[in-house]
Regions:
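Accessory, solvent-exposed terminal regions and/or long lumenal/extracellular loops of proteins
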Residues: 139-257
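Catalytic-domain carbohydrate-binding cleft regions of carbohydrate-active enzymes
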Residues: 1-139, 144-145
Length: 261
């Protein structure tokens, strides 16, 4: 279970092993904690595909890094220089893998220079402190940097099962933020010839306004129109891997739009 949790936040998710069974049905059945805990992370990985795919493009396009030591983004915080058990998954998610058995608490350092939202509880924490996070076997400590814009896709069994015509866009308030949604044909190298599109999102925290810029680029099969369900994350919005409650739905056909939350 702990490995599956860690693997969920690796650039390429794999169920590693050689001679031992690795498929989740070898560890029980639905309704049993070991199966359910692994299925939870697999479903989360699929829902995070818009974030992961867009971040992969950013890494490739801008010569970036997917799994980032904290010091890369928070060099001014000297404590991050010594943190070796946490990493940033893209620029928004801080992950602290649990690497010892039978523990009930796990120490997590939140870098100074940002506030952080607990992904599972929506509890907001100030940066620059160490927390002892309760960690049941089903929970991996994950924190979202304030100002992050996270796109979530539908629950699927494989990556191309459903299109992204109704993405859930989560805003984690507390700072201004940007995110660029990247899309292409999914199954070839035509993006190297310019066959892709990007949509830039900007969050103005003081004005509580999300701006969706005009779409740039195109590719065969691109969605001409779609909907975004925009959710301002808080204590009553829902948490974790489940679809968020409330929010506002906005129709988008490639032209600039703005929504106040």
């Amino acid at each position: 279970v702990r490995w599956m949790q860690f693997g969920t936040f690796c650039p390429m998710m794999r169920s590693h092993g050689t001679e031992l069974p690795r498929e989740i049905w070898n560890f029980g059945k639905r309704g049993e904690w070991c199966f359910d805990a692994q299925e939870k992370m697999i479903n989360l990985r699929y829902r995070l595909l818009p974030y992961i795919y867009s971040t992969s493009w950013d890494v490739s396009h801008n010569d970036g890094t997917f799994m980032r030591p904290l010091v890369m983004d928070f060099a001014a915080d000297s404590k991050t220089h010594e943190v070796g058990g946490e990493f940033l998954f893209g620029r928004s998610l801080l992950v602290a893998p649990v690497t010892r058995p039978e523990v009930t608490e796990w120490s997590v350092y939140l870098p100074q220079g940002a506030d952080w939202w607990d992904f599972w509880s929506n509890e907001k924490q100030q940066g620059g402190q160490t927390l002892n996070r309760c960690v049941s076997k089903e929970i991996l400590p994950v924190y979202v940097k304030a100002g992050s814009i996270l796109p979530f896709g539908p629950k699927v069994q494989y990556s191309a099962e459903k299109n992204w015509d109704n993405l859930e866009i989560r805003i984690y308030p507390g700072a201004d933020g940007t995110f660029t949604l990247y899309e292409d044909e999914n199954d070839n190298y035509n993006y190297e010839k310019g066959a892709y599109s990007t949509i830039r999102f900007h969050w103005d925290d003081k004005a509580r306004r999300l701006t969706i810029e005009e779409r740039e680029g195109s590719f065969p099969g691109m969605l001409k129109s779609r909907k975004f369900k925009v959710v301002l994350v808080g204590q009553n919005s829902g948490t974790g891997d489940r679809p968020m409650k409330g929010g506002k739905t906005i129709s988008y056909a490639g032209k600039k739009k703005s929504i106040k939350l």
